[in-house]
Amino acid sequence: KNDIFLAFKEAVSNSLEAIKSKKKLQPNYERASIVISVYAKSDTANEESFDYMIIKDNGIGLETKGFQRFCQYMNSSKGYNNKGTGRFFLLKSFKKAKYESSYLDEDGKYYDVYFDFSIENRANDLFINIISEGESSKTDSETSLMLLPFDCDKESIRRYNPFLNIDAVK
């Protein structure tokens, strides 16, 4: 039952790989960052519970080839010993994963892609719903992944990650 932790680890690992890929393309790139934000809500009994989490990086972005890889199970072309299985932890642990990504394409222009990855999208075999894609006004690449909602209580989170101070998250 470590699915939530594995999903979180997968998301952070993807951010680290995106930063590493950007450094290969831009050797002078030094502003690497990953920001993790966890949001909670109060229920009717005034108990805090997880509402959603956002993991944002300023790595390479989910460019066209990366998105095509994302759409193929067992595709190892990314490298880093990946096979495309980690995203299924997201499906099992969260109701929906919302991606917003900006990337620099081969034509020298920035593009945005917004899509949902969810069991709700089971009408297609990929579980993907593309919301929009097109040219961007941004001048740097980045990806935000919103994971919502957690389907467990505080004690479950403590059991999976005893180092997370859930009581401090408001």
Predicted regions and their residues:
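Conserved ATP-binding N-box helix of the HATPase_c
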Residues: N2-I36, G86-K92
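Acidic ATP/Mg2+-coordinating residue in the GHKL
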Residues: D57
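Short helix N-cap motif at coil->helix boundaries in the Bergerat
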Residues: G61-Q68
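Beta-strand secondary-structure signal
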Residues: V35-S37, Y52-I54, K98, S144-M146
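Short beta-strand-loop-beta element adjacent to the nucleotide/active-site pocket used for signaling
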Residues: Y39-M53
